[in-house]
Amino acid sequence: QLSIKDAIEKYCIRKVITFHKSVAAASSFTAHGPEGIEAHVPALQAFHVNGNMASGKRDPIMRAFAEGERTLISNARCLTEGVDVPAVDMVAFLTPKRSLVDIVQATGRAMRTSESTNKTTGYVLVPLFLEQVEGETIEEAVARAQFDEVWAGLQALQEHDEVLAEIILHMREERGRTKGFNDQDLQGRVEVFGPSVSLDTLRHAISAQIVDQIGSNWDERFGELVAFNAQHGDCNVPRHWPEQRGL
């Protein structure tokens, strides 16, 4: 809930859909009371729908969500493709959602534009829970963590954002050429925020994993070949060249 609160305040979010694994989790998230999201975000109206609801009950809730000034709706097994949903500013995957098709469809809802607003940016939020053991660096903790939802979300975003796909391609190629990369361009697409850790260190560690998990191995090998050509004047890499065995 705190990550949702921070994102809403930072990016002036007006409409949010949250995705949950179970009806109980979704309903609890938007419950009216101290445990619900409304208790943390002033002037927010929270709603809930799920796949067990009849359309006669769900439709008025969806209208209220669409017509409200600042609204959030939680759902479980409901707001998939084919269900009429208004344009939203952000979708949030608050529990694991493994189907790539579902993730692509959900992120598409955040990417949709609306004639009634001046919206230019859609947001996808995925909370990260990072456990750092004693003596472990943040980079090591990120490498060990299972951030499958992040990688799936970024894979889905590439379906809607060609610039993101191009940025990741160039980062992988740059790492092949220079043994490192500059993630400044990625910061405009992927932002990390939260308490208690060095966010720059965490961001760079996550960027490295993005390059590994989302980028193409071919692009990195191409970068290595570019570096070899710059050093030797040709692309005739010896079969057992020790510096980049991948070539």
List the predicted regions and their residue ranges.
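Short, well-ordered amphipathic alpha-helices
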Residues: 2-4, 27-35, 105-111
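Helix N-cap/beta->alpha junction signal
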Residues: 20-24, 76
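Conserved interdomain linker/interface between the two RecA-like ATPase lobes of SF2 helicase motors
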Residues: 1-21
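Conserved helicase motor "Helicase C" RecA-like lobe of SF1/SF2 P-loop NTPases
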Residues: 23-48
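Conserved RecA-like P-loop NTPase helicase motor core
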Residues: 47-168
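IQ-motif-like calmodulin-binding regions
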Residues: 180-247
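Short helix-terminating capping/connector loops at secondary-structure junctions
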Residues: 9-13, 39-44, 116-121
